[in-house]
C-alpha cells in the first residue's frame, strides 16, 4: 500500500527546533523523525511514499536528494576514501513522491491534493508524521480489512499528565483524576483508509472534523487501541524520544528488533 505522510505543518510548539527545519526533519539521534517513521512502514513492506509538503518543503526535498547513506549504515572504505562499499542501504528500494500541498493547508486539503497520486489504490495508509509506535502494522490493517469500513485510526492514551475534573453547576468538584487513568483515548495519527474516503470530503474541510463526522454518522469509522505510542509535539516530548534513543531504548525501531510483535492488546 502507498503511505501518505503529512509533512507540511509549522511545528510551532517545538520552538527553536523548527526554526531552520520543518517538524518532520527534527532529529531523533542521527536521523529525523520522518526517517524513523518511513523505516517503520518499510519494515512491513510499504515503501511507496507520498510526502505532503508545505512549510520548508525545500528542506525535505534536499534531505532526500542529498541523502547520506553512511550515517546509519556500515560500509567498507578503501583507496583512501575513493572507494566506499555500503553493507546495506536504507532507501534504495523506496519510492518517494514529493507534492507541495501549500503552506497553510489543513490535513484534509493536503490529502485531497494528493488524491490523483492514489489512483488505482483500493486502500492506503496515512500518518501525521509526528509520532512513533511499535504496533505490528499488519494488526491494524487486518482489523480494518475485516471491518469493511471506510476509515480506521490508532487510538492511544493521552501522553500528558493532565487531570480530568468533573464538577457541578455550582462549581463543587465531584472528582479529579489523571487523564491517563480514565477511559479517554486520543487520535494517534496512524490511519488506514479506503479510496472512498474522498467521497466523504468537501473542499477546505479538516479531515478529522466534517469528513470524520460523516463517517461516524454512517458507522464507517473505527479505532484500533494500542498502548505503545510516542508523540513529538513539544520540546519536552522530543527530549524524551532523544533520551530513549541515546539510552538504546527505542522500541519503535522494529526493524532492529528480533521479536517485533509485542503481546496482544485489546481492540
Which residue ranges define each predicted feature?
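Catalytic-core segments of class I nucleotidyltransferases/pyrophosphorylases
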Residues: 122-125, 132-145, 157-160, 172-267
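Conserved beta-loop-beta/alpha segment of the NTase-like Rossmann-fold superfamily
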Residues: 59-169
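Solvent-exposed polar/charged
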Residues: 43, 116, 214-217
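N-terminal glycine-rich phosphate-binding loop and ensuing alpha1 helix
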Residues: 1-67, 98
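Structural beta-sheet core signal
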Residues: 3-5, 51, 126, 151-154, ...
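A structural signal for short hydrophobic beta-strand segments in well-ordered beta-sheet cores
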Residues: 25, 164-167, 223
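Well-ordered alpha-helical segments embedded in enzymatic catalytic cores
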Residues: 33-36, 109-113, 211
Amino acid at each position: 500500500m502507498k503511505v501518505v505522510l503529512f509533512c507540511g505543518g509549522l511545528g510551532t510548539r517545538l520552538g527553536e527546533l523548527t526554526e531552520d527545519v520543518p517538524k518532520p526533519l527534527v532529529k531523533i539521534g542521527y536521523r529525523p523523525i520522518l526517517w524513523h517513521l518511513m523505516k517503520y512502514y518499510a519494515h512491513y513492506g510499504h515503501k511507496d511514499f507520498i510526502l505532503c509538503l508545505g512549510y520548508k518543503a525545500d528542506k525535505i526535498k534536499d534531505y532526500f536528494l542529498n541523502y547520506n547513506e553512511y550515517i546509519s549504515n556500515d560500509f567498507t572504505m578503501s583507496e583512501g576514501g575513493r572507494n566506499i562499499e555500503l553493507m546495506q542501504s536504507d532507501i534504495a528500494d523506496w519510492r518517494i513522491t514529493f507534492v507541495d500541498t501549500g503552506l497553510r493547508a489543513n490535513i484534509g486539503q493536503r490529502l485531497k491534493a494528493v488524491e490523483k497520486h492514489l489512483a488505482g489504490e483500493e486502500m492506503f495508509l496515512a500518518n501525521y508524521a509526528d509520532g512513533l509506535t511499535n504496533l505490528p502494522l499488519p494488526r491494524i490493517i487486518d482489523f480494518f480489512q475485516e471491518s469493511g469500513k471506510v476509515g480506521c485510526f490508532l487510538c492511544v492514551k493521552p501522553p500528558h499528565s493532565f487531570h480530568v475534573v468533573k464538577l457541578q453547576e455550582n462549581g463543587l468538584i465531584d472528582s479529579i483524576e489523571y487523564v491517563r487513568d480514565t477511559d479517554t483515548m486520543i487520535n494517534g495519527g496512524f490511519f488506514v483508509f479506503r479510496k472512498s474516503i474522498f467521497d466523504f470530503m468537501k473542499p477546505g474541510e479538516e479531515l478529522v472534523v466534517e469528513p470524520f463526522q460523516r463517517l461516524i454518522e454512517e458507522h464507517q469509522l473505527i479505532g484500533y487501541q494500542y498502548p505503545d505510542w510516542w508523540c513529538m509535539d513539544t520540546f519536552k516530548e522530543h527530549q524524551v524520544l532523544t533520551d530513549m534513543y541515546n539510552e538504546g531504548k527505542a522500541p519503535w525501531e522494529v526493524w532492529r528488533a528480533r521479536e517485533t510483535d509485542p503481546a496482544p492488546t485489546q481492540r
